[in-house]
Amino acid sequence: MPVITLPDGSKREFANPVSTLDVAADIGPGLAKACIAGRVNGELKDACDIIETDSELSIITAKDEEGVEILRHSCAHLLGHAIKQLFPETKMAIGPVIDNGFYYDIDLDHKLTQEDIDALEKRMAALAKTNYAVDKRVVSWQEARDTFEARGEDYKMAILDENIPKDSTPALYHHEEYIDMCRGPHVPNMKFCQNFKLMSVAGAYWRGNSDNKMLQRVYGTAWADKKALKVHLNRLEEAAKRDHRKIGKQLDLYHMQEEAPGMVFWHNDGWSLFLELEKFIRQKLGQYTYQEVKGPLMMDRVLWERSGHWDKYSDAMFTTSSENREYAIKPMNCPGHVQIFNQGLKSYRDLPLRMAEFGCCHRNEPSGSLHGLMRVRGFTQDDAHIFCTEEQVQQEVSACIRMVYDTYATFGFSNIVVKLSTRPEKRIGDDDMWDRAEEALKKALKANDIEFEILPGEGAFYGPKIEFTLHDCLDRAWQCGTVQLDYALPGRLGATYVAEDNSRQTPVMIHRAILGSLERFLGILIEEYAGKFPAWLSPVQVVVMNITDKQSDYVDNVVNLFKEHGIRATKDLRNEKIGFKIREHTLRRVPYLLVVGDQEMENNEVAVRTREGVDLGKMQLEEFATKLKNQISLRSLNLLED
């Protein structure tokens, strides 16, 4: 007679084994109708799974985040059901849940078109509308294999052969005539899978290996109700308008081309953005007392072997050879920084030593994963490494945290999620060392009043890590900042310092990044601001326009004055109507549009308007220059107001 303990502490006793659905029905018909799955003793289970012993149970509905993930997973099965009905010759591969949705990889000779995607979505809706029940059957490994062999599902057989032990009992989910295999859980009825949309189709290699066959990957999104789906689709529509690749082309910031995949060709205005961002970070480095260094672009393979990177990253490293020596272009800066640290004897009095670099790194990312500025092969890291004693770890990490938040605040990012990854099973050092390291990070976070989530076992083998994920105006998550303790690399590369007792000790190394890469962060900023950069960051801060040729010399004088003040100004003396000029520069997102006619010229004034169309009226030239210069120096996010 199992006794079921619910989240509120109440208990229910049953005469026979029960399922989550049975318990929900015992509580009330409304909950039974809403029940998607259950969390039994901390483990997600299908609503139909039998509970035989005393257990703690949480009933999962579509109101729960886990419930939405489950219905998304079931929508992947629904997609498979529709695909097999419309394209029976398809071989099904995998269909997992992803952020906000799902996908299914399929092997189909016919290349899916938008018309096919529309037809699949229509068929999915028709199937879901019947509210058919999903039948879960737990079978032997051999029965599962026989089932998929009879259906010609080569990929399902490969999963069984290569990933599932023969003594296991896989779960087969029957969607009417369609059968899929999954660890679950899934919805008990397709009534929960009514609010979805198929988004796109792309190529994907089987098992992510380019040596394998290219499959077609159909993406979809699914939500608990129509309102949530509509909000998501509207957000995607807004994201498409803000796409940094589209805006980058409109504003002539950069381009990429086939001859240099994943490498950025910065144009004048884009490079201005890059340099301004670099300048800002460089000022932060000075504020937080960092040295700035510059290491070589490539180093001998032997060094990468000693550092351990060759074993882990060699597939992602670009290599070359010269005079019978093999070199690797650096994918990261840390080994080079240890080489700089190793030059000359270091004392405990020299620590902490904070070393930063705008390091040009390269990684041979798969071509299919490249995405504008967000995923590139050549990038610049705002990378730093702090060499310190173990006693200094907490204060140094605390300073890193302050620097991260100071930096993000300048760009208007305040919604930051922080996660602390702790010791994995396979790790160096003893538990005492890990206890001290993890406690130092926790204390540093708490000292800065930072709420954080702990990810048990997710740290690197050489030390725990803090990750900073910022959320943009569309509530998209971007993992940018990291603070990683490293107890391994300094020792591998022979870094030591003379301790107070004259013994040689190995320093702790703190890897610190704030932006991650400048390229990716600029992509984030382009989309966050929709190309309307704050004045301090804008490639062109002011454009000065004349009404007639009579004001041309005055316009030249105005622009020259701005440049003397360090303001990035340009002029537009074209023989066009002023309304046309204003519209054009508004579309180019120039923060301030200045118009001068005869009256402004006579009074040494400018007529000021913003790109948002706000008329700030006439100002004395020096007055406006001073106000703008002050706004730029403060790195204000807002434009001047009337």
From Swiss-Prot:
Protein location: Cytoplasm
- One GO term describing the cellular component: cytosol
The UniProt entry lists the main location of this chain as cytoplasm
Q: What is its EC number?
A: 6.1.1.3
Q: SMART domains, from UniProt?
A: tRNA_SAD (SM00863)
- Provide the cofactor note recorded for this chain's UniProt entry: Binds 1 zinc ion per subunit.
Protein name, as recorded: Threonine--tRNA ligase
Q: Which organism is it from?
A: Shewanella halifaxensis (strain HAW-EB4)
